[in-house]
Amino acid sequence: MDERFNKWLLTPVLTLLFVVIMYQYVSPSCTSSCTNFGEQLRSGEARPPAVPSPARRAQAPLDEWERRPQLPPPPRGPPEGSRGVAAPEDEDEDPGDPEEEEEEEEEEPDPEAPENGSLPRFVPRFNFTLKDLTRFVDFNIKGRDVIVFLHIQKTGGTTFGRHLVKNIRLEQPCSCKAGQKKCTCHRPGKKETWLFSRFSTGWSCGLHADWTELTNCVPAIMEKKDCPRNHSHTRNFYYITMLRDPVSRYLSEWKHVQRGATWKTSLHMCDGRSPTPDELPTCYPGDDWSGVSLREFMDCSYNLANNRQVRMLADLSLVGCYNLTFMNESERNTILLQSAKNNLKNMAFFGLTEFQRKTQFLFERTFNLKFISPFTQFNITRASNVDINDGARQHIEELNFLDMQLYEYAKDLFQQRYHHTKQLEHQRDRQKRREERRLQREHRAHRWPKEDRAMEGTVTEDYNSQVVRW
């Protein structure tokens, strides 16, 4: 009797166990929810409700589901902030192309990018045309083209001038002999120079000649140096210069004058003559201004250090040269600043002392010339070691208010040119990669049918040979 009862009891128990096991396999979400429910009871912590299946949700009333709290959907892709905003040229990309994504990750980092990895955010302030931002000079070094370097005092021009004669990769490099201040920079196979600068032709137009002097002097000087048989060919003059933060430049010039520099041999030629002593008086009675204090340096109202960058880049003939009675001061300053901006914008190239690597990048892309060694950014200078208070700094900015406006304009134009050139280069590289991948795909497409036909021919030949043998 007991054995028969055990057999009848065993059958429903096994059936129930089978149903439970099958239910777990058919509905695994129930298992997880049941186990989670048991864990919640043990831990006493509240957990968010599981999202039901669409079938169960369809069976429930609509208003009931609207009242229930819903979990947000899982984010797709990386979280916000992990990558930058896509560039405009990325909008026409094929998002499903894995080769494009892999190659995008292989870009070299910007040497001047911040160490934390965040991209520097540049907000343009001035509106420039595409022509103003696009700078590519078809410099013909074998022809008659000449690069003219306008060297403004204390802007890093000496270092940049040495780069021009010693650091450019050329077919015929400049010949610089030890003990000589000037180098010989001849065109390939000719005895003519392609560079007009302190370290190639010397101060042929005067010590630190400005824009007014160079534009009236350089063409005549180069015609004398050139061969008469080449005078029938056209010649292009490409003017370049370097600018610097006005406060740092002013302090550097003060320290230089304090050590005995004068530049009193400068000609300051304008409209065919040099200024009279009344038009351009000196700030010191002796041979030099050695040991001058910063206060004395700033107190001289006709100190040429004031707004030097604007004066050396402007066309002084527009304001009567150095004759301050030619027009009122306000009108004179407006004309000088606007003239300096226009001349700077129309130059073939200008660099900034504070951005050495970007200066090198833009020069190389503008003239299609490569430097041998990279430029170095020296942040410790004599000007940086000068400790001045806020009042003295403000006074220097007031004395150089025209240079301050010019530098803001120049820095904005410089940054826009840099980003524009980078963008164009990035687009060209991307187009080149696309073309290479397209050629590879076409090559594979033409190669595979030939291989298939070759394989078919081999199989047919083997089969026929076997039939012959049979």
Swiss-Prot record:
Tissue specificity statement from the Swiss-Prot or TrEMBL entry: Ubiquitously expressed.
Membrane topology summary: Single-pass type II membrane protein
Region (Disordered): 36-121, 421-453
Basic and acidic residues bias spans: 422-439
Catalytic activity: alpha-D-glucosaminyl-[heparan sulfate](n) + 3'-phosphoadenylyl sulfate = 6-sulfo-alpha-D-glucosaminyl-[heparan sulfate](n) + adenosine 3',5'-bisphosphate + H(+)
SUPFAM superfamilies given in the database record: P-loop containing nucleoside triphosphate hydrolases (SSF52540)
Residue spans of biased composition, Acidic residues class: 88-113
Protein name: Heparan-sulfate 6-O-sulfotransferase 3
Organism for this UniProt entry: Mus musculus
Name of the coding gene: Hs6st3
